[in-house]
Amino acid sequence: MRLYVTPASPWVRRVRVCIDELGIGDSFEYVQTRWPHAWGTRTVEMPADFVEATPVVRIPALVAGDVTLTDSHSIIDYLDGKFGNHRLLAADGPERWKALETNALACAVLEAQIMRRAELLRSGADRSDDFIAKMRDRGLRCFAALEKQTPSFGDAFGLGQITTAVACGYDEWRYGPGWREAAPALASWYDTVTQRPSMKATEPAETPQR
């Protein structure tokens, strides 16, 4: 299987953490993509194989035989169903709905983080400080909501917890530790799960530039 990646993307990281938790890392060829800083607002010319794998030109993208998947949600669902027997996200029932509740909040954080980052990369005249603040505040509200769910996490590290941990890690790496004030119990939980091998192996780094 071929997975198109970049080390900065939290969407890529949640897939890679899932891959490591499922123990299937040796089944993948990881293809590093390169992006200019204008990726958020301008058309970026990419290699033909990448465009074929993902016409929407975003990462991650998975090519697995005759299956091509172009977002982290479908990739994780495919891998967990095919190789994990739905270990990361239950196929149905109350356990699934609770996990999806957590996952949706954590994904909302990721979306806000990426939109904030894209706006910050605009030139000064085009940048909206109000929009940047709006995305920051959205993320903090979601962290506060996840704080309320932290006691229910226990020792589990399924999809909801994985996405939450990735959201915590990206915010701290990109924007600093301010999120911890909104969610101290979540921060304590994060400090524990960040020691997992799957989290250590996927720590974020800047994307190679073109």
Features from the language model and the residues they span:
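Short, surface-exposed recognition loops or helix-turn segments adjacent to catalytic cores
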Residues: A91-P94, F157-L159, P204-T207
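Short, flexible helix/strand-to-coil boundary loops that buttress conserved ligand/catalytic motifs
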Residues: R16, H73, I114, Y175, ...
